[in-house]
Amino acid sequence: MTRIVDIVGREVLDSRGNPTVEVDVYLENGVFGRSAVPSGASTGAHEAVELRDGGKRYQGKGVEKAVAAINGEIFKELGGRDARNQLAIDQAMIALDGTSNKERLGANAILGVSLSVAKAAAKSFGLPLYRYIGGTQAHLLPTPMMNIINGGAHADNPIDFQEFMIIPVGAPTFKEAVRYGAEIFHTLKRYLQDAGYNTNVGDEGGFAPNLKSAEQAINLIMESITSCGYKPGEQIAIGLDCASTEFYKNSLYAYEGEGKCRDVKEQVEYLAHLVDSYPIITIEDGMAEDDWAGWKQLTQAIGNKCQLVGDDLFVTNSARLRDGIKMGAANSILIKVNQIGTLSETLDAIETAHKAGYRAIISHRSGETEDSFIADLTVATNCGQIKTGSLARSDRLAKYNQLIRIEEMLGTQARYEGNWHRR
C-alpha cells in the first residue's frame, strides 16, 4: 500500500522569483507528498550541486534538466519501492547519480524526491510529519533566531555581516517567542523610519538599511529591544551570521563597509570584542569556510562562552563535521537540507553533531518557498533552534506558523527551552 506508483517533478518559482523544483510522490494507497526545494545566495564551495539549465531561459537558472531527471531516471529507479524505507530510497538515488556532490542528477532533484517520500509515508501512517520522522520523543519547540537586519549577500547595502538576529531566550512558549520577535521587528521599523533609513526588506524579510558597521546595526537592535520593554541578554539575546567567506580575500577579512581589513588574529579579536560588548550568544561562519586554523583560534578564544556555528564550514556534511570535531573547530553545525541533498544524510549529520556534543540548528535558505518541511524537521530532531528569517514575507512565516500549530498539537507535551545557552 505504500509503494511508489508515480513521481511528478515540475518547475515552480521560489521567493526570489527564480525557478526551483517541486515534486509530488504518489503511493498506491492514493496519498501523495509534495515538496519544494529551497536555494541559497551565499553558498558554500563544498555544498551539493543544484542542477541549473544554463542558456537564455530564466537567465540560465531554469531547472528543466532536474525535472527531466525526476520524471525519467529517478522514477524509473524508485517506482515500486516502499516509501517507508527512506534510507534505501535515498541511497538508491545517491548511487544512481554516481557523483560525490550529486552534480549529475542535481541535489535539487534528489532532495525534492527525498522530502516528498517522507511526507507521503507520514500521510500513509496518519501521522504529523514531525512525529513520523522523530517518533514519540519529538516534543521540543525550537528557539527562533530571527534575522531582522540583513546585509552581505542578502541585501544591497554596505554591511559586511549577512544577518543580525534576535533570539527570544526568555519567552515561555514558542508562540510567545514569535510575539516578542514581531514586536521588536515593528519597533525597529519605526526607529529606521524616524532616522531616515529605508525600510525595504531583504531576501529573508529583514530590513536592509544603509548602515556602515556591525556595531551600528547591533545598537539599533538593542534600542528596539529596550523600547519594547524587554531586557537584552535576559529575555532577548543577539546572534550574528558573519558569512565571512564572502569577504575573505588573500588571507584577509576585507570589511568594505568599514574600509578596513583584518587578518585572522584581528578577526578573532574583533568577534571576541563584540561578544564582550553585547549579549551575543551565537556567531555563524565567523571565519571563512577553508580557514580551519582561524576556526580553531576562534573556538579556543570564545567557544566556551558563545555558540560558534559552522555553515559554509560544514555544509551539513557528516565527513566535514567529523574533521571539524577532531580539529576543535566550532561547537555547532547549521543544518540545511539542500546543502547535502537527502533527508537521510541530513539526519546523519544531526546525529553526528549530537553524539559529539555539538548543537545543530535547522535553517532555511535565502531563496525559500511556502514549504514548511524544516519546521517539522526541527521538532522531529529535538534540535532546539531554528533559523527561518524575519517576521515578514509569507515564505518565512509559513515555518513560524507551522511551529505554532505543532506547539498547539503537542499541548502539555510541548517544551520550549529558550535558555539553552545557559545549560
Swiss-Prot record:
Where in the cell is the protein located? Answer: Cytoplasm; Secreted; Cell surface
Task: Write one Gene Ontology MF term.
Answer: phosphopyruvate hydratase activity
Name the residues that bind (2R)-2-phosphoglycerate.
Answer: 162, 336, 365-366, 387
Which pathway? Carbohydrate degradation; glycolysis; pyruvate from D-glyceraldehyde 3-phosphate: step 4/5
Provide this UniProt record's keywords sorted from A to Z: Cytoplasm, Glycolysis, Lyase, Magnesium, Metal-binding, Secreted
**Enzyme Commission number:** 4.2.1.11
UniProt cofactor(s): Mg(2+)
Residues that, per the record, bind Mg(2+): 241, 284, 311
Entries under PROSITE patterns matching the protein: ENOLASE
Entry's cofactor comment: Binds a second Mg(2+) ion via substrate during catalysis.
Q: Where is the active site?
A: 204 (proton donor), 336 (proton acceptor)
The Gene Ontology biological process annotation of the record reads: glycolytic process
Catalytic activity, reaction form: (2R)-2-phosphoglycerate = phosphoenolpyruvate + H2O
Check the record and name the Gene3D superfamilies matching this protein: Enolase-like C-terminal domain, Enolase-like, N-terminal domain
The keyword Kinase is annotated on this UniProt entry: no
Q: Which family does it belong to?
A: Belongs to the enolase family.
The role this protein plays is: Catalyzes the reversible conversion of 2-phosphoglycerate (2-PG) into phosphoenolpyruvate (PEP). It is essential for the degradation of carbohydrates via glycolysis.
Q: What is this protein called?
A: Enolase
**Gene of this entry:** eno
